[in-house]
């Protein structure tokens, strides 16, 4: 069965003007959100960007492959995907920015997001899923019985703070909990932001309690 690596071998040399953005590209960027970009990708207060190629070089100048592989982590392979991305023209020159990585024990929140500027006039907003922290897993359990979690509210604020009043089209996605955050943020963001959302991707993301499913904001983003 073909995988992401096979896709990059097949399409990695074609930019988005030749082969438009597809669901596999979404999967790739949702996985990229698991890379620890602290000190590498500019934060949301910087209004600056960095290419994936440079982010990859900077990351591997800080961490060796042996060090990464020695980690006890379910997401430790994400940096190696990033290394694969820069071997072709499809992703290497894309710009990353608006990076956030927060752990808040009091609010029981593990939150991270990054934006990828695709060069086709759209931005992919990638929310990270659960990491290896205790608070991240506790937040997952909270999502099983709370309609609104601190992380979900933070996801809405992230989308509004970075894109309210703009004009570009948005793609919003994530893997696992990140997919849930993508749907929640797209449902409850400001109307002018929601109108610009081209597509929402939840890749193996958990669902919602009935109260959310009945909300008008959620129903507006349904395909």
Regions found by a protein language model. Name each.
Residues 1-76:
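N-terminal low-complexity, Ser/Thr- and acidic-residue-enriched intrinsically disordered segments
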Residues 7-8, 92-95, 103-105, 179-182, ...:
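A short linear-motif detector with a strong N-terminal bias
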Residues 19, 115-117, 219-221:
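A general structural signal for short secondary-structure junctions and capping/turn motifs
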Residues 23, 149, 176:
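Short, conserved micro-motifs enriched in small and acidic residues
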Residues 35, 129-133, 206-209:
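Short loop/turn segments at secondary-structure transitions that flank enzyme active sites
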Residues 44, 137-140, 200, 215:
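Surface-exposed beta-strand edges and their flanking turn/coil or helix-capping segments
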Residues 60-170, 191-197:
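A conserved cap/lid and substrate-binding interface adjacent to the catalytic center
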Residues 152-223:
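Serine-dependent carboxylesterase/thioesterase catalytic core
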């Amino acid at each position: 069965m073909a995988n992401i690596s096979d896709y990059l071998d097949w399409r990695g040399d074609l930019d988005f003007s030749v082969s438009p953005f597809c669901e596999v590209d979404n999967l790739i960027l949702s996985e990229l959100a698991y890379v620890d970009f602290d000190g590498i990708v500019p934060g949301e207060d910087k209004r600056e960007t960095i290419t994936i190629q440079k982010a990859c070089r900077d990351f591997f100048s800080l961490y060796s492959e042996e060090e990464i592989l020695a980690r006890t982590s379910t997401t430790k392979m994400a940096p190696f995907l990033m290394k694969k991305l820069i071997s072709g023209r499809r992703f290497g020159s894309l710009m990353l920015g608006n990076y956030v990585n927060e752990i808040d024990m009091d609010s029981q929140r593990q939150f991270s997001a990054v934006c990828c500027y695709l060069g086709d006039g759209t931005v992919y907003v990638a929310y990270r899923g659960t990491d290896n922290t205790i608070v991240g897993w506790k937040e997952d359990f909270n999502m099983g019985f709370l309609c609104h979690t601190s992380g979900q509210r933070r996801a809405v604020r992230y989308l509004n703070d970075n894109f309210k009043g703009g004009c570009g089209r948005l793609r919003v996605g994530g893997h696992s909990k990140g997919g849930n955050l993508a749907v929640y943020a797209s449902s409850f963001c400001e109307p002018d932001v929601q109108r610009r959302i081209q597509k929402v991707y939840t890749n193996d993301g958990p669902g919602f309690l009935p109260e959310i499913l009945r909300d008008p904001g959620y129903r507006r983003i349904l395909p």
